A protein has these predicted regions:
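Paired small-residue
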Residues: 111-120, 309-317
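A late C-terminal transmembrane helix in Major Facilitator Superfamily
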Residues: 339-372, 380
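Extracytoplasmic gate region of multi-pass secondary transporters
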Residues: 42, 221-262, 269-270
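Conserved MFS/SLC helix-loop-helix module at the cytosolic interface between two early adjacent transmembrane helices
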Residues: 72-109
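C-terminal transmembrane helical hairpin of 12-TM major facilitator-type secondary transporters
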Residues: 285-329
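Helix-loop-helix hairpin linking two adjacent transmembrane segments in secondary transporters
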Residues: 110, 141-199
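Cytoplasmic helix-loop-helix junction between adjacent transmembrane helices
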Residues: 116-154
């Protein structure tokens, strides 16, 4: 007589996720949707230009299309109320990030590249906004500290993976298309935990309880935060877009660009822990003002010195501060809108994205007119100081 084999119960199949699983899954999701789907383009661009004849104007247009995709994703997220649809869109973003990264290898036709870069930008929005909103909502429902510092390790790790991965892949597979395909395969390593450990959709009673919490977002507060976050986006994209170019244009620093970009990511990873601690001690607004001040200094350094030390210190300062500004700002606005943190984050991010589209154009025109980036760096420092002044008008958040 054979023993009857009972199927596993629903409880066994759907065990509650642990905090480390949700965080690690979110980190892997960020590496996939930001580090690969968005940032792999930066270190792979030189090979694409050398081997396909892609000129600077067309390369810049692809970057703009990518930012356009990010803005489109932020717009969708800003008007998405149903948590189930936010969860579905985030899940689709994980698949799209994997496929669009590999698809870049299939053709050297510019319109095809533009399509994949647009979708890659869309994926970035799902990881940055929907993923962070889902994780923050899960933390609040579990009664845990509603901070996103650990989650945003994925941003720094994504930069490191894209920078060092491209350097290694170029030595093994010199062809640009092989490198894109290899990044797509590499994405599977991050896709699996990101997919398996997605924050679950809250049950109806929990969702209703959170939805009952009144939002704490006055119009003046939101506009002030949006304008200061615009300044942060300006500072972020100038360094993210031109750091490698600025370094490579210094004769004494030629060939060091990829290492400087990797240093940005290495600085960002531990910094997220530090900024959460700083915010607990000083309050969120004061911590943000400190991050703005330090990032301004890191932007000015390459403008006043062309030394390798200035490039490295500037990269360290930039990596350590941009991640703090993003993490503290999104967590702050998410806590003030517990019924739909992802939606509130997305609306704020529209100003950050607008700066990402405008700033490179202004900086590029200034660099073309002056023959260098110093003027653009000084303008960026002024914009960052204006953002810090706006923050000073807000009541502190302890």
């Amino acid at each position: 007589m054979h023993d009857e084999v009972n199927p596993p119960s629903d409880a066994a199949l759907h065990r509650p996720l642990q905090a480390w699983q949700v965080m690690l899954g979110g980190i892997c999701g960020l590496v996939l949707t930001i580090g690969l789907a968005r940032f792999a383009y930066t270190p792979l661009l030189p090979a694409m230009q050398a081997q396909t004849g892609l000129n600077d104007a067309a390369a810049g247009a692809l970057a703009a299309v990518n930012y356009g995709g990010y803005i489109a994703g932020a717009l969708v997220a800003a008007w998405m109320d149903d948590v189930r649809w936010r969860h579905r869109f985030y899940s689709a973003g994980l698949w799209m990030a994997l496929l669009t990264t590999a698809a870049m290898a299939l053709s050297s036709w510019w319109p095809a590249w533009a399509l994949w870069r647009f979708l890659g930008g869309l994926c970035g929005a799902t990881g940055m906004l929907l993923g962070s909103g889902l994780v923050l909502g899960w933390l609040m429902r579990q009664g845990r500290r509603p901070e996103l510092g650990v989650y945003f390790i994925g941003l720094g790790l994504g930069i490191v993976v894209s920078a060092l991965g491209a350097k290694w892949l170029s030595a093994v597979w010199p062809e640009w298309s092989d490198q894109w395909l290899a990044f797509g395969v590499m994405g599977l390593v991050f896709f699996v935990p990101a997919w398996l450990w997605r924050p679950p959709v809250p049950p109806a009673p929990a969702a209703a309880a959170v939805a009952a919490a009144p939002p704490q977002l006055s119009r003046r507060w939101m506009w002030t935060m949006a304008l200061s976050y615009f300044a942060a986006g300006w500072g972020f994209v100038i360094s993210a877009t031109f750091t490698v170019a600025i370094v490579e244009r210094e004769p004494a620093l030629a060939g060091q660009g990829a290492w400087v970009w990797a240093l940005v990511g290495l600085a960002a990873m531990p910094a997220v822990f530090l900024w959460d601690r700083v915010a607990r001690r000083l309050g969120d607004i004061r911590a943000l003002m400190l991050a703005f001040a330090l990032q301004t200094l890191s932007i000015v350094l390459p403008a006043v010195s062309g030394s390798l030390l200035a490039a490295f210190v500037g990269a360290l300062g930039y990596g350590a501060t941009f991640i703090g500004i993003v993490s503290l700002t999104l967590a702050l606005v998410g806590r003030r809108a517990p019924n739909n943190p992802g939606k509130a984050m997305a609306r704020l991010t529209l100003s950050y994205g607008a700066a990402q589209m405008l700033a490179p154009v202004v900086a590029g025109v200034m660099a073309q007119a002056t023959g260098g980036f110093k003027g653009a760096l000084w303008l960026t420092a002024a914009v960052m100081l204006a953002g810090m002044a706006l923050l000073a008008t807000l009541p502190d958040e302890g």
